[in-house]
């Protein structure tokens, strides 16, 4: 079994971006990070994104509107960022307060600044194999992990467990694309799938993104499978100062001996998500420069 070290691969991507940004003349790429409320995970995620942006040499502009902000007020804020020539990418951190419609918020971001890749236009471009759009960061990170770990999906059965807008649907589309590293045969499983283990045991590459701790067990995989564990779940652990530890959707101790390659949690997909956000921001900057002539 080989561990796919997402932290190491993400650090390589950050170093590549740092060199690319250092060579730019004039204004540096800028990402606006909008966080609404004090959800502990969101606070941590945004700080991490701000820190990584600074490490690369990007400008990270953190915006903290009140938790009571209305949909109309948030739209006005986004419209202002859309019109701001000094902003290349916009991310509104999810989850948002319940009174806000997240899907409408994602759609409000201008497609050319939608570096989180969750708007309608960019999701559509993924379906069309159009490289001018932005791929949502976790699916993009998964594909990058596979590529840099020597896993070519051509001719392989890729089973995705989970059908979310954030991971399941876009990663399935990416695995299907007619391009190098992709061309997989894809099955998507979800809560209504019958005899799930019979399907997951067919997987050459298994992507688990269901949000349930230890859901994928040893009897659900075949020997030699490549496992990408997207889940980040908190489980009680009295030995930890925080009172919990992070585990994935895969029962790592049981499944890892059967896998040819597997991502850990933490340190697998998570670091890649931030790295790909930064990569998308630099791409947005370059596309805008190109359009400006």
UniProtKB/Swiss-Prot annotation:
Presence of keyword Cell membrane: no
SUPFAM superfamilies the UniProt entry points to: Aminoacid dehydrogenase-like, N-terminal domain (SSF53223), NAD(P)-binding Rossmann-fold domains (SSF51735)
Its EC number(s): 1.5.1.5, 3.5.4.9
GO biological process, one term: purine nucleotide biosynthetic process
Pfam families: THF_DHG_CYH, THF_DHG_CYH_C
Keyword Hydrolase recorded: yes
Quaternary structure and interacting proteins, as annotated: Homodimer.
Protein name per the record: Bifunctional protein FolD
Source organism per UniProt: Opitutus terrae (strain DSM 11246 / JCM 15787 / PB90-1)
